[in-house]
């Protein structure tokens, strides 16, 4: 009808749904939902619960700590149903140990013993027993590496360089100006009359500075006078290992990104470690070492083998490497080999 202004509506077909099909669909929907719930539940269970076997234990502190520098692998094979509870306890101890290791050995930690020593030269400062023991060992062996902090600061400029041209500006091996600077710094760092830490009784230390070095440090803005440098990882790993052993955790190992490792005790099977060596610009594996533990494993290298090695080394396009292994006598990067492997009881 031409006068009918109602919009045209297409006819709707009526389809009878089978009651039988609706029931099938409902059953299938319930089955799929149940499968999804089970899968999600299993996933959550796997995340929350620790399965027997080797597991990487992680720290959970939001405060500055060394957990990014160290990896802890632990064997829960014999833990059975108690693996989750054991992992939780281990994680708490490991988290606190990683935080303590940062506070004790980081020169940048304002609440740590190194900062306290630097802030109060000439005064006896009570420190963590681990820091006291570290300085006692250095004194016993006549090692003055810890006093090279200002020299490390200069080499850090080389390691952060974006190219060979920039690196050569800061590298004492290529720049006479840079070489003169590190020699001048090393002349203070190497001389116990200018700087030394005295090991006192009752876990106390005293930083002794000459007036000349104090004036020099103030004039040139030297903020960090003490830094364990490349050997920091050794003391960090030993501190954490000692904490774990004190609490009865012996079925694992710790390893730092820069080559320090502690195997806490004998495992279910002997530990096997690959030994790598640099040949030209390539790394190859000449051997494997198998042992039952406990044991400390130290592998030093002058070249980057891991991503984070760029923090303490630089390699020129011609393959020449610069590392943080500094001669205290003159501040120059000097090593007798490209890599070194040492085994012992402690790092």
Where are these predicted regions, by residue range?
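Mature catalytic core of soluble alpha/beta enzymes
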Residues: 1-347
């Amino acid at each position: 009808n031409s006068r009918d202004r109602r919009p045209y509506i297409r006819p709707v077909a009526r389809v009878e749904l089978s009651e039988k099909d609706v029931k099938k669909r409902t059953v299938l929907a319930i089955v799929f939902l149940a499968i999804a719930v089970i899968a999600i539940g299993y996933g959550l269970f796997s995340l929350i619960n620790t399965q027997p076997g080797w597991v990487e234990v992680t720290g959970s502190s939001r405060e500055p700590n060394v957990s990014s520098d160290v990896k802890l692998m632990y064997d829960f094979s014999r833990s059975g149903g108690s693996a989750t509870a054991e992992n939780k306890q281990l994680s708490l101890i490991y988290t606190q140990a990683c935080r303590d290791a940062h506070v004790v050995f980081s020169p940048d930690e304002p609440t740590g013993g190194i900062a306290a020593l630097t802030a109060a030269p000439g005064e006896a400062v009570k420190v963590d027993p681990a820091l006291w023991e570290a300085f006692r060992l250095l004194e016993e062996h006549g090692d003055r590496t810890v006093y090279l902090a200002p020299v490390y600061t200069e080499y850090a400029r080389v390691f952060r360089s974006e190219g060979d041209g920039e690196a050569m500006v800061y590298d004492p091996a290529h720049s006479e100006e840079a070489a003169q600077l590190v020699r001048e710094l090393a002349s203070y760092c190497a001389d116990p009359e200018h700087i030394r830490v005295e090991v006192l009784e009752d876990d106390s230390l005293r930083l002794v500075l000459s007036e000349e070095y104090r004036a020099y440090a103030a004039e040139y803005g030297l903020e960090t006078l003490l830094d364990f440098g490349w050997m920091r990882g050794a003391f960090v790993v030993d501190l954490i290992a000692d904490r774990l052993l004190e609490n009865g955790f012996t079925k694992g190992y710790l390893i730092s990104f820069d080559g320090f490792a502690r195997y806490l005790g004998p495992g279910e099977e002997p530990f096997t470690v690959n030994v790598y060596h640099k040949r030209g610009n390539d790394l190859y594996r000449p051997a494997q070492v198998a042992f039952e533990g406990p044991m400390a494993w130290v592998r030093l290298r002058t070249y980057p083998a891991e991503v984070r090695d760029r923090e303490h080394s630089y390699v020129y396009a011609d393959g020449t490497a610069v590392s943080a292994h500094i001669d205290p006598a003159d501040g120059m990067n000097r090593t007798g080999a490209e890599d070194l492997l040492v085994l012992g009881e402690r790092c």
